């Protein structure tokens, strides 16, 4: 073997001699994983949890298209079309509208990293896990975080928020439009105007609500809005949508310190996404194939129309609510006007372990629902109807599966 390597080294020349010598003096100590020598196998699942949701055929097909270079003109054209799609689904004319190469958490972090500076006052509506996450990130950035904490299922009134604005004089308020951990739909009308009266920016999480409930970024005075790809848009997780008002942009561009993240620096991302009128420069390699799928998800929602999508989700949720109540289950959010159409929460029925019910549905029927998350853990079951999954047929499937689960899962005697 060594003679063969020596001959190979001589034949390839001095530049190749180094790696030939390296191969001769080292051994592979880690074998190829046996699991990777088998074909990939994916089970069939009906994803009726809080996300991700199933992919429609058009979105799946987009994910199988051939790769383009991330700086090709055709890729930039796709990015421009995505930006227009975001402006439509957000109902905004903001030029600073783009995609973050990362999940909804990444968009939240991008918003906070670019807007907040050390010492800034940050008012956070914490009525579920997403407010908790926003407060956590704010603390890491050195902001003075002021949580307005409510139990799962709670929401915020204009009066409550105004009291917080007057007391803490924040530069930024965070609210979750669709709190998927508790199933609450937070009203937004009037909050933007209220924030601006106190010289405060309004940041809204619409990951679970976008496309499923009415949302008007410009008309509702929302300064920063973000969402995800894997809910109503029915695209793979891993990309997120983000838009900034001119007021928010001015705050970012006039900050005294650099944002703590290069990857999430909006000034660079604005150039990458063609938002600053300058020739595009390399910043990072975008997930090109994921952008294909996101583009198709936005296209499907655009073809359907926002108002039709909102109506579809409202009707599917109402049908689900009726079927659940017919089973004797209690909806966690009492006020119908505050129920998130895309994610319904049900109080865990007395005597049952929520994990038994979730496991029964996935193992017996291949249907995913989930338990609570963060503060709602152990309190609720969560059922999602998003995008192509928001149908009466799926409601019938999941409620019949729940009926059987309640008959077969162990129940403690009280």
From Swiss-Prot:
CDD domains for the chain: AGAT_like
Range of the transit peptide: 1-23
Keyword Cell wall biogenesis/degradation attached: no
Residues bearing PTM N6-(pyridoxal phosphate)lysine: 231
N-terminal signal peptide: none
Gene Ontology CC annotation, any one: peroxisome
Record EC number: 2.6.1.44, 2.6.1.51
Pfam families: Aminotran_5 (PF00266)
A single GO molecular function term of this UniProt record: L-serine-pyruvate transaminase activity
UniProt keyword terms in alphabetical order: Acetylation, Aminotransferase, Mitochondrion, Peroxisome, Pyridoxal phosphate, Transferase, Transit peptide
Cofactor(s) needed: pyridoxal 5'-phosphate
Residues involved in substrate binding: 382
Protein's recorded name: Alanine--glyoxylate aminotransferase
Organism expressing this protein natively: Callithrix jacchus (White-tufted-ear marmoset)
Gene: AGXT
